[in-house]
Amino acid sequence: MKRLQKRLHGHIVVCGFGLSGSVAVRELLESGVDPNSIIVIDQQQSALESATALGVAGLLGDPSREDILQQAAIRVAKAVIVTVSDDQTAILVTLSIRSIAPETKIVVRIQEHVFQRQLRQAGADVIVSSTKIGGLLLADAVESRYIVPFVNDLLSARGRVTLLERPAAPREVGRATNTVTGMLIVGLVHDGRMFSFYEDAPRTIEEGDVLIVMESTRATRTEEA
């Protein structure tokens, strides 16, 4: 573990390797994240065996315990994904993480939306309500045939279309959002405020803006190559 800690910096910690945790790890790997930069914490040895079979590191223990989090070098982690079995445990884990790592990004999966406020107070940066998202997609599927497959494609690293969040490039600064070619800008964040293409007029991109863009994965892979 000491050898592992020495190379951990800017890594991703996944607390809980159940269904959601395993999907998250696989998706990170599919998107190109180095397996050596992922560590999974779980209390079940069988879960860790499944995780390490994917090439990531495993740490046996309770993710709400500060000593376990310290072993995962949580203070210098890039982000922590919390996908534990119940929402109240998620709150406890989030509190423990935030007490050690005030700057680390914390992403939490919850099952009941009513716990969102408590998780915000505990220090969660991003909260994903799996039941709410699932319910919305189920409702959409009643009246449509193609929306759910499109959303699945959009969210998957293996999909044909990808949704990216990135800083505005120098060549884009000064241009209107509807004149940038090669991608679809669906959102722009300026000074912390989100502007969406479907509810706001085209905006001029400024230095420091964050763009949310939709583009083909083929184009993305070509740029990376």
Where do the model's predicted regions map?
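Cytosolic regulatory regions of ion transport systems
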Residues: M1-A225
